[in-house]
């Protein structure tokens, strides 16, 4: 194909609280810097996201996109007689329109189900029209699309559902996964399908799926103004080094229940608070647990933190704790928040070596067992007692590791196989 001028990204975009909605933003912004003239994020109407029960940021805290990035939220097609396909039909229809105008286009889908499935359907329709189609596709598997769809389909003996996702994935020009762990998970799940039905998905996945780590915009985390850090923290009633931080979705797999128990057992509570930042399906349950804790007066929940404030909270914490644990519905396939914390250069990271977290942490975090509040307590106490020079040295090593996930580096590696010539850096 000719050098692409348009990038279309299909994703659950802002205001969804998800590292991959942020990744989509970062790749879109980098595409502008690399010479793409038309960058579009095709996503779901906000009311549909609300109805789905996804954790959402406050709309007034969502940062604007740069000029040149268009966010499209296609309206549903059909009426009440189409019970569960109206919104997907709107997205597929819009993709068909973008794929048939002859503009050289790269289409990147994040989440195989339903986004890569939608791209595969739209391409089939686009080719059938006889109109000019000049599209290269990339599908990025984030992990939960395997654990939440393919594995469930295999467990329930639903071959068709698993085959639908895997075949749509392999129909794309380029297949990537967000970590080595995720790649192995895909191959393993495909092998289960093959063993039951005599298919050959695993061999194809093993041969074709590469790794593309999530793209993070490192700029907001680097060289933070010290006075501004203090000002942002003071506005929340906090001071540098006075709190232990959790920042992610409030879901069972994130281990916040263990963190609350661990904090109340720690000696660090004598001089620190626990700040829990995020929204999610377990929020009410976790607030109730915290209220019943004997450390209740030291635990704060913040549900209105936007992307602009996040780096300052990370930079000022005494320790950052993400005690994720594997669940049937979710496994941490990378750990974007861990990489962001390392870029911010705050206190030590405490986490669990589950899923792809080890790839994000790169040996620069304190690894503890899952489901172990006592281990969390010990790790917090060790972190807050660490001498300042050791904290600084650890932060410098961690940041050097995390810089490989900067959006420009990730974009260039991903698109090196796609673009027919080296990317042009915008002035």
Residue ranges of predicted features:
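Nucleotide-activated donor-binding/catalytic signature segment of Leloir-type glycosyltransferases, i.e.
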Residues: 123, 284-309
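Nucleotide-sugar donor phosphate/pyrophosphate-binding loop at the beta->alpha transition
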Residues: 123-140, 144-168, 191-197
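Donor nucleotide-sugar binding/catalytic pocket of nucleotide-sugar-dependent glycosyltransferases
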Residues: 136-139, 162-231, 300
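Conserved donor-binding/catalytic core segment of Leloir-type glycosyltransferases
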Residues: 176, 216-218, 233, 237-254, ...
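A charged, aromatic-enriched C-terminal amphipathic alpha-helix characteristic of glycosyltransferases
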Residues: 254, 371, 388-420
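Acidic donor-binding loop of glycosyltransferase active sites
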Residues: 315-330, 347
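Short hydrophobic beta-strand element within catalytic cores of glycosyltransferases
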Residues: 338, 343-351
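Conserved acidic donor-binding segment of nucleotide-sugar-dependent glycosyltransferases
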Residues: 351, 363-374, 382-388
């Amino acid at each position: 194909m000719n050098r692409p001028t348009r990038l279309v990204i299909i994703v659950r975009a802002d205001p969804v609280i998800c590292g991959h909605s942020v990744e989509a933003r970062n790749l879109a912004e980098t595409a502008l810097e690399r010479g793409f003239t038309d960058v579009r994020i095709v996503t779901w109407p906000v009311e549909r996201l609300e109805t789905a029960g996804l954790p959402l940021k406050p709309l007034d805290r969502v940062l604007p996109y740069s000029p040149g990035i268009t966010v499209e939220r296609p309206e549903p097609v059909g009426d009440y007689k189409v019970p569960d396909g109206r919104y997907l039909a709107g997205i597929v229809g819009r993709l068909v329109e973008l794929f048939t105008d002859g503009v050289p286009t790269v289409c990147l889908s994040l989440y195989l189900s339903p986004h890569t499935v939608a791209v595969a359907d739209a391409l089939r329709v686009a080719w059938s029209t006889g109109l000019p189609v000049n599209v290269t596709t990339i599908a990025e598997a984030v992990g939960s699309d395997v654990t939440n769809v393919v594995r469930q389909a295999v467990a329930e003996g639903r071959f068709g559902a698993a085959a639908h996702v895997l075949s749509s994935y392999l129909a794309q020009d380029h297949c990537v996964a967000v970590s080595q762990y995720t790649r192995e998970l895909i191959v393993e799940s495909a092998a289960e399908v093959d063993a039951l039905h005599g298919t050959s998905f695993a061999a194809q996945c093993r041969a074709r799926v590469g790794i593309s780590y999530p793209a993070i915009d490192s700029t907001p985390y680097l060289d933070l103004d010290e006075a501004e850090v203090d000002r942002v923290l003071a506005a929340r009633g906090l001071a540098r080094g006075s709190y232990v931080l959790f920042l992610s979705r409030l879901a069972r797999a994130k281990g916040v229940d263990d963190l609350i128990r661990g904090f109340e057992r720690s000696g660090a509570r004598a001089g620190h608070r626990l700040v829990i930042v995020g929204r999610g399906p377990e929020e009410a349950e976790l607030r109730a647990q915290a209220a019943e804790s004997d450390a209740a007066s030291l635990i704060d929940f913040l549900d209105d933190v936007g992307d602009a404030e996040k780096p300052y909270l990370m930079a000022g914490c005494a320790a950052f704790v993400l005690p994720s644990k594997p669940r049937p519905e979710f496994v941490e396939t990378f750990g974007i928040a861990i990489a962001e914390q390392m870029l911010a250069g705050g206190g030590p990271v405490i986490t669990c070596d589950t899923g792809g977290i080890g790839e994000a942490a790169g040996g620069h975090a304190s690894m503890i067992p899952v489901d172990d509040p006592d281990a969390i307590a010990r790790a917090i106490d060790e972190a807050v007692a660490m001498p300042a020079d050791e904290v600084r040295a650890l932060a410098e090593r961690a940041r050097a590791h995390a810089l490989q996930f900067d959006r420009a580096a990730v974009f260039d590696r991903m698109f090196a196989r796609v673009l027919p010539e080296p990317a042009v850096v915008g002035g």
